[in-house]
UniProtKB/Swiss-Prot annotation:
GO BP term, example: dauer entry
Cellular localization per UniProt: Perikaryon; Cell projection, Dendrite; Cell projection, Cilium; Cell projection, Axon
Assembly: Component of the SCF (SKP1-CUL1-F-box protein)-type E3 ubiquitin ligase complex.
PROSITE patterns the record matches: FBOX
LRR repeat feature ranges: 122-147, 148-173, 174-199, 200-225, 226-251, 252-277, 278-303, 304-329, 330-355, 356-381, 408-433
Protein name: F-box/LRR-repeat protein fbxl-1
Tissue-specificity statement: Expressed in neuroglial cells such as the socket cell and sheath cell, neurosecretory motor neurons and regions around the pharynx and anus.
Domain of life: Eukaryota
Domain F-box: 54-100
A GO CC term assigned to this protein in UniProt: perikaryon
Keywords, ordered alphabetically: Cell projection, Leucine-rich repeat, Repeat, Ubl conjugation pathway
Name of a matching Pfam family: LRR_6
Keyword Repeat recorded: yes
Length: 466
């Protein structure tokens, strides 16, 4: 018996000396390796009884565990909370709920769930996304706004049951709000904009796309009161008229991004107001605003010298008389979408090539008057910058276009759908020289001669087609 005890004591002493030696060596190694060695020593030197009593939540301090939980997303936190009582307390700690995204649970989220979450988060919550949660009502938002006054980022995209009442509570309690997405909240009106404008002066981003009930007055209130607003997204706001910015030009100096896609009532007067007021403008989308003419482009060329992205797809009244002065005045343009601007010719492309040296992406789809000559000029002037070129449905372009584009070093994608005079052989040759460039093209299958179909007696016409 004494011998066994002496052997056990000797083994324990040897183990202790070995552990000490490892610890000394660890000081000379990389910190990560040292940490792993110390961890392995801790695990391997525990007796079975000690292992049973040394769960992770007992070995690691609460502060460390909380830090680990802070890296988990909403779904992982919910799952972790079901492991044990200790983990439930840690997972549901308010400090882990500074950013909450319920998009994954959009179909299941009810008002009661959101209210409970608001009570749990309290003053910790800074970012909340209820994107697509169509079952959420004003009552849930009332709880959130009153209990989470430090909210800075809120997305209510497609929360169609949310009304002006929610915006009233946002203005009353959430004075730190700087990002608000109300896209497709179709019940929102100008009253909501009054509440937001009065109570959220730090707002820098607002998206009220497809909110049909919002009219000029609502947008004007926001621009007048929110001096830090630099991004305004108004896609599909059909209630806006050409005078929406007429009385607030002086309040648009901070605007850098403005999206007016499919605001059908806007005219050259609107663009003139934008150009006069939003002198810091870098991004403008007016696609499908089909009442604007060359006068709009002249105004932008005269005042919007910081413009980098301009989207004008579907603006069919625009032509060379507008784009040429635009190119001369907006020399920082990086992306320009002119799809369906079918009145432009090589003169526009040449002006862009000569003046807009930073141009990276250009869409010329359905610009049927442009030829190989202007593409050659564009390619020679933008060998180092051009990334994307969309040329689908440009019937005058030929194989020469690909020959010119072969030397554009930065090119990543070319669209050539329905360019009848560009051959398969030219595309194959291009891909051989530039295999890393995506080429999107389509060639209709050859229709079989009629006499071949007639000679197939006994086979129905459907089978011949198939």
């Amino acid at each position: 018996m004494e011998t066994a005890e002496r052997i056990s004591a000797a083994a324990s002493a040897a183990s202790s000396r070995r552990a000490k030696r490892l610890a000394q060596q660890a000081h000379k190694t990389h910190p990560v390796i040292q940490a792993k060695q110390n961890q392995m020593y801790l695990i391997t030197t525990l007796s079975p009884a000690q292992v049973d009593n040394s769960l992770i939540n007992r070995v690691l301090p609460k502060e460390v565990l909380l830090k680990v939980f802070s890296f988990l997303d909403t779904k992982a936190l919910c799952r972790s909370a079901q492991v044990c009582r200790s983990w439930s307390i840690l997972a549901l700690d308010g400090s882990n709920w500074q950013r909450v995204d319920l998009f994954t649970f959009q179909r299941d989220v009810k008002t009661a769930v959101v209210e409970n979450l608001a009570r749990r988060c309290g003053g910790f919550l800074k970012e909340l996304s209820l994107k697509g949660c169509e079952n959420v009502h004003d009552s849930a938002l009332r709880t959130f706004t009153s209990r989470c006054p430090n909210l800075e980022h809120l997305s209510l995209y497609r929360c169609k049951r949310v009304t002006d009442a929610s915006c009233e509570n946002l203005g009353r309690y959430c004075h730190k709000l700087n990002y608000l997405n109300l896209e497709n909240c179709s019940s929102i009106t100008d009253r909501a904009m009054k509440y937001i404008g009065d109570g959220c002066p730090n707002l820098s981003y607002l998206n009220i796309s497809w909110c049909d009930a919002i009219q000029d007055r609502g947008v004007q209130i926001i621009l007048s009161n929110c001096k830090s607003l630099d991004t305004l997204i108004l896609r599909g706001c059909e209630g806006l008229t050409e005078n929406v910015f007429g009385s607030v030009e002086a309040h648009m100096g901070a605007i850098k991004k403005l999206n007016l896609l499919q605001c059908f009532q806007l005219t050259d007067i609107t663009v003139q107001n934008i150009a006069n007021g939003a002198t810091a403008l870098e991004y403008l989308c007016m696609s499908n605003c089909n009442q604007i003419s060359d006068r709009s482009l002249v105004s932008l060329g005269q005042h919007s010298h910081n413009l980098k992205v301009l989207e004008l797809s579907g603006c069919t009244l625009l032509g060379d008389n507008g784009f040429i002065p635009l190119a001369r005045g907006c020399r920082q343009l990086e992306r320009l979408d002119m799809e369906d601007c079918s009145l432009i010719s090589d003169h526009t492309i040449n002006s862009l090539a000569n003046n807009c040296t930073a141009l990276r992406e250009l869409s010329l789809s359905h610009c049927e008057l442009i030829t190989d000559e202007s593409i050659q000029n564009l390619a020679s002037k933008h060998r180092e910058t051009l990334n994307v070129l969309e040329l689908d449905n440009c019937p005058q372009l030929t194989d020469s276009t690909l020959s010119h584009l072969r030397h554009c070093k930065a090119l990543k994608r070319i669209d050539l759908y329905d360019c009848q005079n560009v051959s398969k052989e030219a595309i194959v040759r291009f891909q051989h020289h530039r295999p890393n460039i995506e080429i999107h093209a389509y060639f209709a299958p050859v229709t079989p001669p009629t006499d071949q179909v007639v000679n197939r007696g006994g086979i129905c016409r459907c089978c011949v087609i198939l």
